[in-house]
């Protein structure tokens, strides 16, 4: 009996996974299982009466009929229901009618139940009348010819633009094949190895997404491997200039294994010296702690990491094992290659500034996004298996990368800052950025508005920028719109009425809020009036003069007057209470930390590690730096972590 049970169990598992599911599909396989169980019962009962052969024939016929009926009547309906992915929907259908309505919206262009996953293609026409197809794996959308195009293209193009001359590239996860197609647009590429565990996904990429991926999977330079990514990395003799790893979200069953430290170590072992590894991560259906775990794990192997934004809620980590500094001029030349330019033109990226504006955190900084003590996800301690699913359940979003986006700052540490220092923003740059942001979407609307304001300064009579400003003002009212009307109110605009100290404080608060809201790497608003009032308040409001001096230091720094900013900062922290009043910043508690981050940043840029470390230790004694937590000013915490780790590494050497 034991032997028969064992043989039956093994045969059932093998036949179901490798034969019945791929051939019959999930619904018919379930019907077959029901029929076989009923057949066994029917034959068992018949054996007592001696009619085993007749019962067996009857049972087989009944099972075949059941499978045929289910396949013909329920097959497509079953498939439609399962690929909808309602388990992700925060608002499930309220009725059967609504459920059927949702299921009928899409045209099921392809459906296949494979041994490892159910793969489907849904075709739909959007509101603009444009057709689009979406790849769904186990009910979860993993690629499309619509809103996902920017991420799919940039996952291939960004590392290719950053690398000086990539010849061999590995892509983990086929998806739509668009990433592979984008990589193949570079003439230096001799071979792309594509590793995908599901043959159904590669079939979809080859047959359905060919118009969108440049028919990449039929390109002779593309070599497709149906294999587990870890197995491939551990067995291939090849080395690669770039590895792009883009599995699904880590909360999907089994996917967290390709976010582990061991997996990244396997990637590093197959990278050539100077190679880059790019990891697609999602900011949606997650949280800051899960995001920190992914960054810390990736950074434990590739410590020189930068963070890039590829769409509204999709991000890309690009890391190297050694310090990495891209050549911006060479990047511009690669961007100008006709095939590359045409590929990026599909997502309105036409100029170097379009590419550089996507970098959120600079090389060498992104590793320090994760607080000290963040748990590393490994095969032996798979914390992401639980944490990612927990974060998915509460439908959160990782906000740290957006709060730390360097594009929001007038003097970014990113490649964009380096580029703008050499080539100031032009009207054509602004036009290109506006098209790009409108195409891919961007969560930080103030950045978009700052581009439009700079464009308006450069071309005040251009009807396009005026139309865009008015459109976005109507659709997305600016948070500083009310502030702008208040600061121009007669009570504030008439300087003679400002003998009232409370009115002066309120005006300074409003002007500073407007300044902070409007500043970015692209545009710095005029701050003369703000500086005049803050300067006056340092004399007229001695009880709060430390706050006024600290704010004035911040604005001076934004304007590039570093010497004045340093003097004001030191005065604001001076222990002489008789001269500067009580050491109290309760009116603007975040202002000192912001200035501390700027001063540490200045030392790092100047290569003065000792000066940066002295400031970190000083500010830590003051209670502003707590690198083990995701609290306080996040830029300050990130820079402090970088200084401490760099100093420790220098001592060890």
Q: Language-model segments: what does each one mean?
A:
Residues 140-295, 299, 311:
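The AdoMet/dcAdoMet-binding core of the Class I SAM-like
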Residues 444-456, 479-495, 520-538, 564-574, ...:
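Alpha-helical repeat scaffolds
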Residues 1-46:
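Membrane-embedded alpha-helical segments of integral membrane proteins
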